[in-house]
Amino acid sequence: MAAKRKTGFTLIEMIIVITLIAIAMTGITAALYPRSQQSAEQVLAVKAAELGRAVLDEVMGRAFDENSGPNGGVPECVLVATTGRETCTLPSKLGFDKDENANTKTLYNDVDDFHGLTGSVKDVLGADISADYQRYNVEIKVFYEQNNGGVMTGQDAATITDYKRISVVIIDPSGNRYPFAATRGNF
């Protein structure tokens, strides 16, 4: 009578298979890790772009200057003192008007009221929405822009011009800076 042969795996064969699977899993994980990191960075960038556009839209929705008219800036403020017309705000006076501060955003009536605003994210009504944008920060700078023969330079002008540059920088939780800018005309 012939002896039955036993079937199955030996302990050594099982250890070899486990080792090969571990090596394969390590290689696959190492190949996929950079992609997951890039994916997270893209999510932060998209969120920053969304926030930057919203902040810029909020600022651009205001009048050119506190001395401009309420109907689309008509009558517009003037660069040089003229009888019967309001002069635009001096470059040194850009920023909060009287009775305005960082906590009274609903009182902002012109773009330069946002000048120097920094910190966590607040909506149009001044409510804190930093829960939706955790660890995101906003920096806003408004200045008169130099106009070199119809070409906007993006540079700060020392005198009043017909153009204000609104510069918004969004800083994401990783510290990456996302700049946004627009020019508002005095028309």
What does each model-found stretch correspond to?
Residues 5, 9-53:
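Aliphatic-rich helix starts adjacent to a transmembrane/signal segment
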